[in-house]
Amino acid sequence: LNKIGGSSAKTKFKKLRFLFDFALAFHYLCMSLKNYMCQKPDMKQYAKHDGSAVTKDIRPQIKLCRKEEFENLWPQINDIFDKARQYMRRNGNNVQWTNGYPQKQTVASDVADGCFYLICLNGRIVACFCIRPSPEPTYAKIYNGQWPDDEPYNVIHRLASDGSVGGIALLAIRFALDKGNLRVDTHELNSTMISILEKEGFIRCGTIYVADGTPRIAFQKQGTRH
């Protein structure tokens, strides 16, 4: 009986030891895979125009547009504005960004004031936007609502993308939020921007009127430096 009992105990011990060793090996395997994934470069396969694949860095970089480079970069910036207008028209927004807005002199003023930014990917400009500090003259009066506070704020304007990279608008908005309290306005027909702002937690505050007299929906969110 003792032999039988001892044999049974040894068998159980061997099974427990096997399970322990297996669990330990599985743990180390998971840790190795985790470390491998964390060390992997943030890369993705993109398709060239000819259909072949090329590996490129997928992390867009935000940089301030410098005065000395603006003239050379303007054709690329203006092309992005054109593509943004085309996107608006295709999606039923025929009233925003008309008459060639944003004009070159407007953007040149943004650049001169050090508040115009470029979003670049692999050396190519894919989007642009402006962040200006308060006060914004057209925000002095708000209708059918009110601003949640009277604290200093920033305003994001002239946000445009060439459409080649997803999530660019959100990237720009979060970049602006890192600088503090942020107010944004957009047309009621700009469903894409409205959706982005609402998903990001912006409060719909009321209606403001821009310089040409047309209405815009006003939004605000407190940034991380508020």
Regions found by a protein language model. Give the residues of each.
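Conserved GNAT acetyl-CoA-binding A-motif
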Residues: 178-189
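Conserved acyl-donor/pantetheine-binding loop and adjacent beta-alpha core of acyl/acetyltransferases
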Residues: 130-164
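Conserved GNAT-fold acetyl-CoA-binding loop/helix
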Residues: 85-105
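Conserved active-site alpha-helix within GNAT-family acetyltransferase domains
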Residues: 188-206, 214
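Conserved acetyl-CoA-binding loop-helix of GNAT-fold acetyltransferases
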Residues: 164-178, 195-199
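Conserved beta-hairpin
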Residues: 113-129
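A short beta-loop-alpha structural element at the N-terminal edge
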Residues: 58-80
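A short helix-loop-beta-strand connector motif used in the catalytic cores of GNAT acetyltransferases and
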Residues: 105-118, 135-137
